[in-house]
Amino acid sequence: MKIFEFSPKIGIREIDHIRHRIDLGNDTFATGKISYEKVDELCRVLREFVDIMRGYKVEDFKAYGTSAIRETENTMIVLDQIRQRTGIRIEVLSNSEQRFLDYKSIALKGQDFNKIIEKGTAIVDIGGGSIQVSLFDKDTLVATQNLRLGVLRLQELLNKLNAKPSKYEGLLEEIIESQLSVFKRMYLKDRTIDNIIIVDDYVSALIQKRLTGSQTPGYVDSASYEMFMQIMRTHTKEEIAARFGISTESIPLIFISAVLILSLIHISE
């Protein structure tokens, strides 16, 4: 949740940002439904958000749901429970609506966005259930494709395979590259990808902090990214958590997202 202040003098200013991770998608992609336990936790957190908004005297708010709610079989039940127990009405975004808002946020936030997309650029939105890859060339969107390679979906697939952690990267690469190879044949062809813009809840935050070897926060070259991957491969969860200031619980999902990004780098080379 983000709290903003609007005023004629300073325009829009972010004054608070509160985050609580609940992996609703684990239930959606494993069983097709969000469990009562997850709904209870979600409602509890949303009630706390409502209390925070009251403290700030918030006059209006918007709450959105994406693939974890959109793809569950009990969407209407979940939305009704949230409304009754928290007073919050969730607006469930379609895939295209979600991507449109993501692109707007990138364009508004990145001062160099227009300059970047003059060259071959892929915007990759990594969600829980799928990823959206959009190709820009000479300042124009030339192709966009949704692939069912979301982080939580891949995690559930690894769980079903009952694979050892040492085998995760190899299995992920096989799964990811089988779909990306089709995408490459259909859309890349002779195009060159010079830049990849990542939108996710996992690796992006680390890039903003500045990865090993990166000279500028928010940017990383392929060589520095390979160094980051080597750290992820060779260090324990505790060591990685201490190095990057993250929780150990988030590392499995960060690793899956990191392998996805590495595969995208490889097909663009």
Which residues are covered by each model-predicted region?
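N-terminal basic/disordered segments at the start of proteins
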Residues: K2-R13
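Helical "lid/coupling" subdomains associated with nucleotide-phosphate turnover
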Residues: I3, D23, D27-Y56, A68-V78, ...
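Tryptophan-centered short beta-strand motifs
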Residues: G11-E14, L141-T144
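N-terminal glycine-rich anion-binding loops that anchor highly charged ligand groups
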Residues: I12-I22
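Post-signal peptide N-terminal segment of secreted/secretory-pathway proteins
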Residues: D60-F61
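Short glycine-aspartate micro-motif
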Residues: T121-D125
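Active-site-adjacent helix-turn-beta-strand microarchitecture at beta-sheet edges
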Residues: G127-S130
